[in-house]
UniProtKB/Swiss-Prot annotation:
Disulfide bonds join 2-10, 5-15, 9-20. One of its GO terms (cellular component) is extracellular region. It is found in: Secreted. Negative results: Does not affect sodium channels Nav1.2/SCN2A, Nav1.7/SCN9A and Nav1.8/SCN10A, acetylcholine receptors alpha-3/CHRNA3 and alpha-7/CHRNA7, calcium channels Cav1.3/CACNA1D and Cav2.2/CACNA1B. Does not impact cell proliferation. The modification 4-hydroxyproline is found at residue 12. Expressed by the venom duct. It comes from Conus textile. Belongs to the conotoxin U superfamily. Its main location: secreted. This is Conotoxin Tx6.5. Keywords: Disulfide bond, Hydroxylation, Secreted, Toxin. One of its GO terms (molecular function) is toxin activity. The cysteine framework is VI/VII (C-C-CC-C-C).
Length: 23
C-alpha cells in the first residue's frame, strides 16, 4: 500500500494497483 497516497500518488501503475488515487 502506498504510504504517501494522501499527499503524493505513487507511479500510476502502482497507485492503481494499491487502490490509491491522486490528491
Amino acid at each position: 500500500n502506498c504510504p504517501y497516497c494522501v499527499v503524493y500518488c505513487c507511479p500510476p501503475a502502482y497507485c492503481q494497483a494499491s487502490g490509491c488515487r491522486p490528491p
